[in-house]
UniProtKB/Swiss-Prot annotation:
The lineage of its organism: Bacteria, Bacillati, Cyanobacteriota, Cyanophyceae, Synechococcales. Forms part of the ribosomal stalk which helps the ribosome interact with GTP-bound translation factors. Disulfide bonds: none annotated. The keyword RNA-binding applies. GO terms for cellular component: cytosolic large ribosomal subunit. The gene is rplK. GO terms for molecular function: large ribosomal subunit rRNA binding; structural constituent of ribosome. Keywords: Methylation, Ribonucleoprotein, Ribosomal protein, RNA-binding, rRNA-binding. This is Large ribosomal subunit protein uL11. GO terms for biological process: translation. Part of the ribosomal stalk of the 50S ribosomal subunit. Interacts with L10 and the large rRNA to form the base of the stalk. L10 forms an elongated spine to which L12 dimers bind in a sequential fashion forming a multimeric L10(L12)X complex.
Amino acid sequence: MAKKITAVIKLALQAGKANPAPPVGPALGQHGVNIMAFCKEYNARTQDKAGFVIPVEISVFEDRSFTFITKTPPASVLITKAAGIAKGSGDSAKGQAGSINRAQLEEIAKTKLPDLNCNNIESAMKVIAGTARNMGVSVSD
């Protein structure tokens, strides 16, 4: 018989830098999860993605065991890295924060494809282009 899930916790943590301090400790501690075991496993899985914020979805079971799934970095983080800017424009209608080219857009779309609600790369590129536009980042050919 399958174990019953008691909680699903969603966190966004720096890759390879999870520690028992907030927000990890309180979020996992209230469900009785072994915090250090999670931190070690998360850091081992995300070691190669250093510098990115990696969202994680933790499923906690009745017996206090857990499993987790790491997602791809948020599109906004990938766009700011590609454009070489610190953050997007405060008012995307008036000011441009930077620009990315079509090749960079395609690379970001390929990275995000597993987490997007898309079936092909063209529709994923449209989703990422919309995110870039909302951040004040233009997409050039």
